[in-house]
UniProtKB/Swiss-Prot annotation:
Keywords of this entry: Acetylation, Cytoplasm, Phosphoprotein
N6-acetyllysine sites (modified residues): K106
Protein role: May be a allosteric regulator of serine/threonine-protein phosphatase 2A (PP2A). Inhibits catalytic activity of the PP2A(D) core complex in vitro. The PP2A(C):TIPRL complex does not show phosphatase activity. May play a role in the regulation of ATM/ATR signaling pathway controlling DNA replication and repair.
Residues recorded with modification Phosphoserine: S265, S270
Cell membrane as UniProt keyword: no
Subcellular compartments: Cytoplasm
Protein name (Swiss-Prot/TrEMBL): TIP41-like protein
InterPro entries: Phosphatase_reg/MetRdx, TIP41-like
Source organism: Mus musculus (Mouse)
Interaction with PPP2CA as annotated region, ranges: 173-271
Gene Ontology MF annotations: protein phosphatase inhibitor activity
Xref: Pfam families: TIP41
Subunit structure comment from the entry: Interacts with PPP2CA. Interacts with PPP2CB, PPP4C and PPP6C. Interacts with IGBP1; the interaction is dependent on PPP2CA. Associates with a protein phosphatase 2A PP2A(C):IGBP1 complex. Interacts with PPP4C and PPP4R2.
Organism phylogeny: Eukaryota, Metazoa, Chordata, Craniata, Vertebrata
Length: 271
């Protein structure tokens, strides 16, 4: 679980023609949460919902991609078969106490599992999503390069009524000639299941596209008896033990009508 300081911050960083923005602030107010829950047709939202938190990568021409909690929850499938676990009924009952206790609770994914891969920005100009067999060069990422900028943004987190955790966070690091982003949805239902949906985004300054890789991993706890339980709470450590259920590789191709380097800007952070 992440440690939450809840200190508001806003950081901008220039990387060639790109402006990288990381905004972090407090959790949403209850009135705003209720309004958004109605809009999303969900009985409740994650306990810690950071609706104004965002990590944005935007080109000087206007197109780009951003990552936010609201759009991530729009990708939650409330109509597929729900997880049937011992804690589900108890957990849902705890969420229906109070003024809405007499309402009929429609089925929804109480784990908040999302396959969100980011929100494309721009109106007339947008990134074009193209399937590819190319992969992110992990060896390049292992190279010792100076980190010019790093930020991590929590989008939502829920402890599932003390039965585990469901969280979504995004982090980015910028090197002299490239940037790498990881969006991670992590779900642990104690004694039942571990699930991890990762979206990786990589761009090299001399390329006219970004590479985006999405992987979904999952395993029942019963199939992880050979793994030390201490790793169940460590996403980076447990991922290697989770079988891949889905993998998608895409290129996010820049619009043809733009100069990939419209401005000669320096890679400098600003508060």
């Amino acid at each position: 679980m992440m440690i939450h300081g809840f200190q508001s911050s806003h950081q901008d960083f220039s990387f060639g023609p790109w402006k990288l923005t990381a905004s972090k602030t407090h959790i949403m107010k209850s009135a705003d949460v209720e309004k958004l829950a109605d809009e999303l047709h969900m009985p409740s939202l994650p306990e810690m919902m950071f609706g104004d938190n965002v990590l944005r990568i935007q080109h000087g021409s206007g197109f780009g991609i951003e990552f936010n909690a609201t759009d991530a929850l729009r990708c939650v499938n409330n109509y597929q078969g729900m997880l049937k676990v011992a804690c589900a009924e108890e957990w849902q009952e705890s969420r229906t106490e109070g003024e809405h206790s007499k309402e009929v609770i429609k089925p929804y994914d109480w784990t908040y599992t999302t396959d969100y891969k980011g929100t494309l920005l721009g109106e007339s100009l947008k990134l074009k999503v193209v399937p590819t067999t190319d992969h992110i060069d992990t060896e390049k990422l292992k190279a010792r390069e100076q980190i010019k900028f790093f930020e991590e943004v929590l989008l939502f987190e829920d402890e599932l009524h003390d039965h585990g955790v469901s969280s979504l966070s995004v982090k980015i690091r910028v090197m002299p000639s490239s940037f790498f982003l990881l969006l991670r949805f992590f779900l642990r239902i104690d004694g039942v299941l571990i699930r991890m949906n990762d979206t990786r985004l990589y761009h090299e300054a001399d390329k006219t596209y970004m590479l985006r890789e999405y992987t979904s991993r999952e395993s029942k706890i019963a199939n992880l008896m050979h793994v030390p339980p201490s790793l169940f709470t460590e996403p980076n450590e447990i991922s290697q033990y989770l079988p891949i259920k889905e993998a998608v590789c895409e290129k996010l191709v820049f619009p043809e009508r733009i100069d990939p380097n419209p401005v000669d800007s320096q890679s400098t952070p600003s508060e």
